[in-house]
Structures are given as C-alpha cells and as structure tokens.
C-alpha cells in the first residue's frame, strides 16, 4: 500500500487497483486511509476484484496462490462497507461447457448490493494458454476476424466465441440494475461520473 500511496502523492491522479487477492484488516485500514487522502485531493480510488468462477475456479487459477472466490466476495462486501465502490471483474468468461454461466450469475447475485458495476469480457487464447488449460484449439469455436498479435511477441491470440454467455450475464446484470461493461475504462468512467 505504501508504494501506491507514494505514486498517488507524486502523480495526484485517480487510483485504480485490480486484485485477485484480499486485504487483511491492517491493509484494509491502510486502503481506507489512502482512499480518504485520494478523495480529499479531489480524486477517486477504485478497487476491482477479479473473480470468474466459484466451483470451477481451479480451471483458470491455482487455488493455492489466490484467495477463494467466497473470500473475494466477502472482500467486495468489506470494500463497500468502508465506502469504496468496488467493481466486479468477471473475466475472462469461458464457454458454458468449461465454466457454467450459472456460476458467473451466482457471482453477480452475491455481489449485487455491493458492486458499482461489472466488467465482463471473453477469453483470448493462444497455444500457451490452451496448454495451461489442458485444452486444444479444436475445443472452442472462435469469433471471426478477432485475432491479433500480442505486443512485439509473435503470439497470435484468438477470441473464443462466448457471445451467448456474455448475453446471459448482461441479462442478469440488467435484471439486478447493475451496469455491465466489456472493458475497464468505460467502467472506471462510469464510477467516476457516478460520484460527481
């Protein structure tokens, strides 16, 4: 938290933290103090918590290295309780056969009273990612003309077709009155404008 504080004091800009981990009580207190300092300077602090599955989490994350989904849900509630406007980062979304959409809908329901919005988008894969997932290219259907090279690395990324899954999540968010965005920047702008 100290590095974040130093960066804020140097640049005097909004602060956006994305995490899959959770903060202990001391860190949460420090976050609250920093949030007040940021707000006093006329800026805003946002915290996005990344969760994209409940029971199937081990498909995309090593459960020994990050907080459990239920603990992250509790963390979102803690952030809301101290006056922050947490964002649920529900991405990447996998095809229903890999991670059921119902799990993602449960995440939205469980955080609906505490998040300001949801950011949810599809899954981009390359050979390395497929290998880590224990899958092969033929396991998925892909969006047409949605390929790109990542940075300077010759690494072709293809986007898995999850339009049905995203539509279901958008419907769930709409039914609960929660805005859903595909990218972080519109979500950040939404929360900042919500406050002004």
Language-model features: locations:
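Conserved AdoMet/S-adenosylmethionine-binding subsite of the radical SAM
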Residues: 1-156
């Amino acid at each position: 938290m100290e590095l974040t504080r130093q960066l804020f004091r140097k640049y005097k800009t909004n602060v956006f933290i994305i995490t899959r981990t959770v903060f202990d009580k001391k860190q949460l207190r420090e976050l609250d103090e920093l949030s007040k300092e940021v707000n006093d300077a006329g800026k805003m602090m946002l915290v996005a918590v990344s969760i994209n599955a409940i029971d199937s989490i081990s498909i995309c994350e090593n459960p020994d290295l990050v907080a459990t989904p239920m603990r992250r849900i509790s963390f979102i509630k803690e952030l809301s309780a101290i006056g922050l406007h947490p964002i649920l980062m529900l991405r990447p979304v996998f095809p229903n056969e890999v991670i059921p959409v119902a799990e993602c809908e449960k995440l939205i329901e469980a955080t609906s009273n505490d998040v300001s919005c949801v950011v949810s988008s599809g899954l981009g894969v390359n050979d390395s990612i497929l290998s880590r997932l224990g899958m092969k290219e033929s396991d998925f259907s892909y969006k047409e003309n949605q390929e790109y090279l990542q940075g300077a690395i010759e690494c072709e990324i293809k986007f898995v077709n999850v339009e049905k899954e995203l539509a279901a999540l958008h419907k769930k968010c709409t039914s609960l009155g929660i805005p859903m965005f595909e990218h972080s920047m519109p979500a950040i702008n939404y929360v900042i404008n919500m406050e002004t």
